[in-house]
Amino acid sequence: MTVKLTIDCMGGDHGPSVTVPAAVNFVRSHADAHLMLVGIESAIRAQLKKLKAADNPALTVVSASEIVAMDDPVEVALRKKKDSSMRVALNRVKDDEAQACISAGNTGALMAVSRYVLKTLPGIERPAIAFALPNPTGYTTMLDLGANVDCEPQHLLQFAEMGHALVAAVEGKERPSIGLLNIGEEVIKGNDIIKRAGELLRTSTLNFRGNVEGNDIYKGTVDVIVCDGFVGNVALKTSEGLAQMLSDIIKEEFGRSWLTKVMAVLALPVLLRFKKRVDHRQYNGAALLGLRGLVIKSHGSADAYAFEWAIKRGYDAVKNGVLERLARAMEENAGSLEQAKRDAGGPGSASQMASPIAGPVSGQPAEPYSAQSSKA
């Protein structure tokens, strides 16, 4: 089976200078992949010519006349730039011409346009950004990592349901364990939203293990960690910064003198393994869960190596049938999610009415909602 992916070539800080080389490298190592490169045609073809890939049959150029800038407000991306590379790429997924879309574009815009074009799965009010972070024995899936900076308790329950379905589908675990990220393990800890979310999770059918703390993220304490997008994004960026700092310190220390340089040569195999394990670029690419189509969000600052990993995330998700399995799980749990929403106050509650991001369950926002224009 050919895996067809669309690439938003104009998204991110570097546009085609990063996305096109990444796409070219990817198809050279994945014979069953076909990538549609969406964006300003002249810019894409110039990169393909430079890389001697202009005639590669695994690459198709799809023209789009507009670009969603990293600092564009959501309203501009959704209402005005209807021929943007981001939207055209997502439309290909909606029309079943591609199986997933990969973009390094503005997070808020990508979330809004994806939700408008693809709609959400039954029972899901807000999609969430999810990714599997390494731990000593495998991976811990964490969500949300930046799509929703403010959440209601029922949204955190929905994130837990999606995380459960994702881990069950990809890792084959029958009952993945769930943890709620908090400032302490005790039930009394946290703000009101976290406490209410904990109550919903405890009464759900999920394998909820209670609150977890920041130091549990990389321990493998639970299979899935749930949090709002503000906390998740800060935790993710902090982790990446720490990994980079450790690499820089080791490089600096081994370069201090001729003796330490000799020691570095002797320790080279270990250092190379360490560098590979802490290189955050290979963990680039997070899925937007809860949509009726696969969307992978890359860091806006990603280089070609990192963006190639984001493409691989989309490729692997298609291969593993993640969307189909997630949709099936959400359909099975739709009743419990609806009950949780009523328990939390329902769509008519003051807290939800005050949140312009919420929109109807169908996934079609009545008005474009505001979100961060982050480079997450």
Curated annotation (Swiss-Prot):
InterPro entries recorded: FA_synthesis, Phospholipid_synth_PlsX-like
Lineage: Bacteria, Pseudomonadati, Pseudomonadota, Betaproteobacteria, Burkholderiales
Gene3D superfamilies documented for this protein: Isopropylmalate Dehydrogenase
Catalytic activity: a fatty acyl-[ACP] + phosphate = an acyl phosphate + holo-[ACP]
TM annotation in the entry: none
Disulfide bonds, paired cysteine numbers: none
Entry annotated with the keyword Lipid biosynthesis: yes
The organism's place on the tree of life at top rank: Bacteria
Organism: Paraburkholderia phymatum (strain DSM 17167 / CIP 108236 / LMG 21445 / STM815)
Quaternary structure note: Homodimer. Probably interacts with PlsY.
Family per record: Belongs to the PlsX family.
Name used for this protein in its record: Phosphate acyltransferase
Broad class of where this protein is predominantly found: cytoplasm
Function: Catalyzes the reversible formation of acyl-phosphate (acyl-PO(4)) from acyl-[acyl-carrier-protein] (acyl-ACP). This enzyme utilizes acyl-ACP as fatty acyl donor, but not acyl-CoA.
Key words, A-Z: Cytoplasm, Lipid biosynthesis, Lipid metabolism, Phospholipid biosynthesis, Phospholipid metabolism, Transferase
Gene Ontology MF terms: phosphate:acyl-[acyl carrier protein] acyltransferase activity
Pathway per the UniProt entry: Lipid metabolism; phospholipid metabolism
Disordered as annotated region, ranges: 334-376
Cellular component GO terms, alphabetical: cytoplasm
HAMAP family xref list: PlsX
Location within or outside the cell: Cytoplasm
